[in-house]
Amino acid sequence: MKVRVDVMPKEGVLDPQGKAIGHALGTLGFTGVNDVRAGKVIVLDLEETDPARARSTAEEMARKLLANTVIEGFRVEVAAE
């Protein structure tokens, strides 16, 4: 079962990567970009067949390793099969 984990900096946490991307976009002539937040996407292919258990497992993985929960939030999405 495919599970997607989106990890993003929490609101109010400095995001230097997002700021650098925003600056680069402006340098390239793109206008109207008010803010950029940069995170990561992790796609897991789990052997689990029960969507609820797959979600629970991915959430535990995110809390323990995939996200630094002090400064990052995460969202888990189980792919419909």
What are these regions (language model features)?
Residues D6, V36, D45, E77-A79:
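Solvent-exposed beta-strand sheet faces enriched in polar/charged residues
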Residues G29, D45, T69:
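Conserved functional loop/turn residues at catalytic and ligand-binding sites
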Residues F30-R37:
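N-terminal glycine-rich anion-binding loops that anchor highly charged ligand groups
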Residues V13-P16, T49-S56:
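Short, conserved charged micro-motifs
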Residues G12-L28:
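Short amphipathic alpha-helix segments
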Residues M1-E11, K40-L44:
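Short glycine-/aliphatic-rich beta-strand segments at the starts of folded cytosolic domains
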Residues A52-E81:
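C-terminal structural segments of small proteins and small subunits
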